[in-house]
Amino acid sequence: MNVTHVTLSPGAKTPVKLASKTGEILVKNFTNGDLLVSIEKEDFEKNYVKIPALMAEVLSECSTHSSTRSYFFDDVYLKSTAGGEVEIRCLKV
């Protein structure tokens, strides 16, 4: 299982390169503030998931799936209101 640990600064958008491409991740927010997570670099402010402090969420790239193929990603963009530790686990490799 591929696991990435990241230390975030408050308010800074941080790009994270995962060890391998995946279609699903588990993001654990160990910070004391909200965590914004996106796989969209350009449209980060429009396309993100908000994970509350000390919570976790499974995220899947389902909007680009078709009946013939799936798209995987290896870039994740994070932004925390409080800064602190975040863990990302690749679930589908």
Region roles according to the model:
Residues T14-L18, P52-D74:
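Beta-sandwich interaction modules
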Residues P15-L26, F30, D34:
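N-terminal acidic leader/helix
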Residues T31-V49, I88-L91:
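Short, surface-exposed beta-strand/strand-loop-strand elements in extracellular ectodomains
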Residues E40, C62-H65, A82:
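Serine/proline-rich low-complexity intrinsically disordered segments, especially terminal tails, linkers
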